[in-house]
């Protein structure tokens, strides 16, 4: 099973797409940073013909590659890009009551290298990974948006364990189920936090394994399972293998590994391995038995995880462009998928083919 391409745009020649989210007829896309572009806004009321309505660059030396939208507000990160000598660090807030024409209304001015990936589904508090001054790498923070014109830091948490030589303990982002946050923490893997009080997070437990770069930790609501990606961060042949695991949160153990895509992807240039998952946000497609994974040069993969011990791939799509690096995705409630490429490929809109569409409908939460 697969998908058909509904439309494609190179985002005005700034095809380094990263995180993306839909809000009404607007689609917000962050950019990796190679192009110098920061954020693109598209009118996707006609998915077959997406139209750019706004686009603005990132500050010099900075990438603004993450977006979150809820409560008629858009949040955008500011983070040092690579080893830039001059950059800005912070969190920017836009009013999107007019979704296609965001208006900047607030900013938290940070220090250090800045904010990486934000998670916010509405309400007073957002949370994100960030590198404040005095820290060599990312920790996890909570930010108060009660006054969106003056966001402020409300809490921070970091793993209080010695980092072994050759390992990198760095927070990425957390997804919540109830009062538990499942936080990807790089080579420290999966950390569970009690966030009954978001301003006072407490460590519950940690599960680790061989391999690192733990990125996204998606709880499958009501199943006691978390699907975890380890991000591939090395190009080309001979890169370390990175996998997607299913973790039993009650037994605190890995129960299975999603089968990697078949083919010669590992021998191709650029990255081969997992990156992001569709995160089952409210208002989007939601399923506790189908998991969508972006897999860099192996495109988009869909897995059936009804039997957590025996997950299987049920659908795939690889863009025809040269050297694809499929990066992030958003799945609409109707099963339509928006996918970004991190190099030059820009944005794709995909429609599930009939057999796959039937499966998605049957498994929708």
Regions found by a protein language model. Name each.
Residues 1-365:
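Feature marking well-ordered beta-strand scaffolds used for ligand recognition
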């Amino acid at each position: 099973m697969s998908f058909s391409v509904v439309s494609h745009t190179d985002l005005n020649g700034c095809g380094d797409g990263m995180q993306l989210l839909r809000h009404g007829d607007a689609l917000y896309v962050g950019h990796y940073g190679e192009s110098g572009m920061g954020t693109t806004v598209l009118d996707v009321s006609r998915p077959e013909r997406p139209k750019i309505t706004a686009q603005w660059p990132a500050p010099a030396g900075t990438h603004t590659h993450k977006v979150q939208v809820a409560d008629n507000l858009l949040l955008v990160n500011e983070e040092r890009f690579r080893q830039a000598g001059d950059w800005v660090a912070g969190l920017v807030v836009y009013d999107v009551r007019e979704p296609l024409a965001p208006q900047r209304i607030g900013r938290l001015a940070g220090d250090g290298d800045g904010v990486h990936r934000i998670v916010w589904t509405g309400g007073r508090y957002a949370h994100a990974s960030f590198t404040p001054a005095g820290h060599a790498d990312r920790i996890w923070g909570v930010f108060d948006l009660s006054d969106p014109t003056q966001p402020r830091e409300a809490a921070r948490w970091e793993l209080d364990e010695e980092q072994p030589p050759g390992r990198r303990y760095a927070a990425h982002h957390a997804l919540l189920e109830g009062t538990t946050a499942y936080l990807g923490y790089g080579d420290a893997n999966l950390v569970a936090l009690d966030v009954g009080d978001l301003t006072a997070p407490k460590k519950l437990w940690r599960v680790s394994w061989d391999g690192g770069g733990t990125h996204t930790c998606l709880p499958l609501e009501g199943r006691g399972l978390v699907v975890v990606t380890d991000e591939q961060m090395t190009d080309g042949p001979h890169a370390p293998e990175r996998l997607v695991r299913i973790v039993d949160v009650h037994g605190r153990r890995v129960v299975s590994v999603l089968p990697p895509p078949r083919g010669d992807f590992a021998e191709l240039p650029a990255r081969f391995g997992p990156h992001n998952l569709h995160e089952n946000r409210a208002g989007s497609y939601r399923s506790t038995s189908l998991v969508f994974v972006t897999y860099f040069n192996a495109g988009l993969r869909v897995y059936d995880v009804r039997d957590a011990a025996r997950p299987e791939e049920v659908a795939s799509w690889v863009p025809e462009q040269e050297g694809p690096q499929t990066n992030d995705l958003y799945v609409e409630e109707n099963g339509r998928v928006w996918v970004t490429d991190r190099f030059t490929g820009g944005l794709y809109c995909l429609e599930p083919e009939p057999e796959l569409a039937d499966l998605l409908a049957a498994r929708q939460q």
